[in-house]
């Protein structure tokens, strides 16, 4: 995924989030938020499974974002997940994803990807949960976000240096990333919006089956 494509992907997703095309639903597990959005391109079959499970099969898509997590994010949350199936053919991310306000920040912790590994302005590295992540920032100007369709905001990224193996239980200790970001002057906002473990794709095909807790 080229950088301009990723920016389009993020902006388009955020625009539709701002008009509530994402739905939240209670589940039996600790998750309480179900995210399911597509721009209508291609075929995206998403299933909100029991507890923290979801699955998605996609073919020749435009942009889509599917995931499960929490209505209110937290800098102290430890996210556990098992991607029993993670098989993108083209552009896609397996990522912790969310937003804060005051200030408005969009953040990613990317554990795996398809054909494109995201980058930005390099800030350093952080070691967490058995891997090393590169830290990047990017800035969006007059772009869609959860607060409207013409906003300026910063994106924070932790991107694993190598794709994380899937098929077994995995952990993202989010506080490690928050603290590392803070050490580089990358402060998150004080008002936490949703936080999900997402499958995100753009102009690709594939399948995933993820359980989050």
Curated annotation (Swiss-Prot):
InterPro entries: ConA-like_dom_sf (IPR013320), GH11/12 (IPR013319), GH11_AS_1 (IPR018208), GH11_AS_2 (IPR033119), GH11_dom (IPR033123), Glyco_hydro_11 (IPR001137). GO terms for molecular function: endo-1,4-beta-xylanase activity. Keywords: Carbohydrate metabolism, Glycosidase, Hydrolase, Polysaccharide degradation, Signal, Xylan degradation. Residues 1-28 form the signal peptide. The lineage of its organism: Bacteria, Bacillati, Bacillota, Bacilli, Bacillales. PANTHER family: ENDO-1,4-BETA-XYLANASE A-RELATED (PTHR46828:SF2). Changing residue 200 to S: Drastically reduced activity. The active site is at 106 (nucleophile), 200 (proton donor). The keyword Mitochondrion does not apply. Belongs to the glycosyl hydrolase 11 (cellulase G) family. Pathway: Glycan degradation; xylan degradation. It catalyses: Endohydrolysis of (1->4)-beta-D-xylosidic linkages in xylans. Residues 29-213 form the GH11 domain. Its EC number is 3.2.1.8. The keyword Signal applies. GO terms for biological process: xylan catabolic process. It comes from Bacillus subtilis (strain 168). It holds the Pfam family Glyco_hydro_11. This is Endo-1,4-beta-xylanase A.
């Amino acid at each position: 995924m080229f950088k301009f494509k990723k920016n389009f992907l993020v902006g388009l997703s955020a625009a539709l989030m701002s008009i509530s095309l994402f739905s939240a639903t209670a589940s039996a597990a600790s998750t309480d938020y179900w995210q399911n959005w597509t721009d209508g391109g291609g075929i995206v079959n998403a299933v909100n499974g029991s507890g923290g499970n979801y699955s998605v099969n996609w073919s020749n898509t435009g942009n889509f974002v599917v995931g499960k997590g929490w209505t209110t994010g937290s800098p102290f949350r430890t996210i556990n997940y098992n991607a029993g199936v993670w098989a993108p053919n083209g552009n896609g991310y397996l990522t912790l994803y969310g937003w804060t306000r005051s200030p408005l920040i969009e953040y990613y912790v990317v554990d795996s990807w398809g054909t494109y590994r995201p980058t930005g302005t390099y800030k350093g590295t952080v070691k967490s949960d058995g891997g090393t992540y590169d830290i990047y920032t990017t800035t969006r100007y007059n772009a869609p976000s959860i607060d409207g369709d013409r906003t300026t905001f910063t994106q924070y990224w932790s991107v694993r240096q190598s794709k994380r193996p899937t098929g077994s239980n995995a952990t993202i200790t989010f506080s490690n990333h928050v603290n590392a970001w803070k050490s580089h002057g990358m402060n998150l906002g004080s008002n936490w919006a949703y936080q999900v473990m997402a499958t995100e794709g753009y102009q690709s095909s594939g399948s995933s089956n993820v359980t989050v807790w």
